[in-house]
Swiss-Prot record:
Belongs to the thiolase-like superfamily. Chalcone/stilbene synthases family. The lineage of its organism: Eukaryota, Viridiplantae, Streptophyta, Embryophyta, Tracheophyta. Substrate binds at residues 200, 219-220. Gene3D superfamilies: 3.40.47.10. It comes from Oryza sativa subsp. indica. The keyword Acyltransferase applies. The active site is at residue 167. Pathway: Secondary metabolite biosynthesis; flavonoid biosynthesis. It catalyses: (E)-4-coumaroyl-CoA + 3 malonyl-CoA + 3 H(+) = 2',4,4',6'-tetrahydroxychalcone + 3 CO2 + 4 CoA. Pfam families: Chal_sti_synt_C, Chal_sti_synt_N. InterPro entries: Chalcone/stilbene_synt_C, Chalcone/stilbene_synt_N, Chalcone/stilbene_synthase_AS, Polyketide_synthase_type-III, Thiolase-like. This is Chalcone synthase 1.
Length: 398
């Protein structure tokens, strides 16, 4: 009789050999594009708030300072005219909002996922795990179930649905995908972030300027990545390796960013010192992540930072003495798409690997080997992912 297999032997066989690797990235936005220069006039007109002249001037200044050129939004003028309660500052409107996002969030996620799967080039039956993240609405079964059905994933795909996480969650999906890939040999994880502002859009209020900050910054977008360990380089092309991933709550930051799902939709509340809280703690986060690697020059690594707003990026740059070039991909995504909550950092990863190839860099990380990805959001929560780039071959740049 053969000896029984030990638990240790089973565990060894279950685990992957190498680190989790990003194998493909796809992004998608709604068709409706909104230019920031035109937005204050449109926003105050559609919300019937044109009599608030001083408030409109404040909002115009917010938009001017946002460093955003354009955003994409599912909400069109027609949809808002049909749903006037969504245009008030506080009016019962959750049903109307839910009716939109429950359909559109998985649909936008599908568009991004299809692009990632196409780039990956493998049959979707090889997808073993699905992680879906959104702060836009809630449903049962969730957006993960809807997406699995839309894509025709196998019925036994292992799903994880993350609702109501907020702007840090692009880092969260990578951290979770990393653990899934490294602890399940042969796993291929489809991780998707899909965000639609229909749940947060509301009219202006003179007594709640923090709500208007969100109206000036937020945009719609979805991004998807395929993550797996031990890539088969005959048919799979690695983009970035994930070396470590961690989450922390910043000290003395309670209430800095809050969101509450109510009859009136999702309301956001921001404290002014959010950029200060993040910049004050950024060096500790970098030190915790990179001291084990012997790295302390923050200009020697590539940067992917959630662009919560320009003030956060400005203060982080100043605090750690970053060259302007380090945040180029991050600022490009802020400019061209706005703050898409959890999806942003995946858009930035996509921009970075594409720009690195176009500019003739030796690696996917702007020619550098090591990099950091930061997510910032409610808590105040910070996600830190240490990345390692891969060499760009002549074929990969094509």
């Amino acid at each position: 009789m053969a000896a029984a297999v030990t638990v240790e032997e089973v565990r060894r066989a279950q685990r992957a050999e190498g680190p989790a690797t990003v194998l493909a990235i796809g992004t998608a936005t709604p068709a409706n594009c909104v230019y920031q220069a035109d937005y204050p006039d449109y926003y105050f007109r559609i919300t019937k708030s044109e009599h608030m002249v001083e408030l409109k001037e404040k909002f115009k200044r917010m938009c001017d300072k946002s460093q955003i050129r354009k955003r994409y939004m599912h909400l069109t003028e027609e949809i808002l005219q049909e749903n006037p309660n969504m245009c008030a500052y506080m009016a019962p409107s959750l049903d109307a909002r839910q009716d939109i996002v429950v359909v559109e969030v998985p649909k936008l996620g599908k568009a991004a996922a299809q692009k990632a799967i196409k780039e990956w080039g493998q049959p979707r039956s090889r997808i073993t795990h699905l992680v879906f993240c959104t702060t836009s609405g809630v449903d049962m079964p969730g957006a993960d179930y809807q997406l699995a059905k839309m894509l025709g994933l196998r019925p036994n795909v292992s799903r994880l649905m993350m609702y109501q996480q907020g702007c840090f969650a692009g880092g969260t999906v990578l951290r979770v995908a990393k653990d899934l890939a490294e602890n399940n040999r042969g796993a291929r994880v489809l991780a998707v972030c899909s965000e639609i502002t229909a749940v947060t859009f509301r009219g202006p209020s003179e007594s709640h300027l923090d709500s208007m900050v969100g109206q000036a910054l937020f945009g719609d977008g979805a991004a998807a990545v395929i993550v797996g360990s031990d890539p088969d380089e005959a048919v799979e092309r690695p983009l970035f390796q994930m070396v470590s991933a961690s989450q922390t709550i910043l000290p003395d930051s309670e209430g800095a960013i809050d969101g509450h799902l109510r009859e009136v939709g999702l309301t956001f509340h921001l404290l002014k010192d959010v950029p200060g809280l993040i910049s004050k703690n950024i060096e500790r986060a970098l030190g915790d992540a990179f001291t084990p690697l012997g790295i302390s020059d923050w200009n020697s690594i590539f940067w992917v930072a959630h662009p919560g707003g320009p003030a956060i990026l400005d203060q982080v740059e100043a605090k750690v003495g970053l060259d302007k070039e380090r945040m180029r991909a991050t600022r490009h995504v802020l400019s061209e798409y706005g703050n898409m909550s959890s999806a942003c950092v995946l858009f930035i990863l996509d921009e970075m690997r594409k720009r690195s190839a176009e500019d003739g860099h030796a690696t996917t990380g702007e020619g550098m080997d090591w990099g950091v990805l930061f997510g910032f959001g409610p808590g105040l929560t910070v996600e830190t992912v240490v990345l390692h780039s891969v060499p760009i071959t002549a074929g990969a740049a094509a």
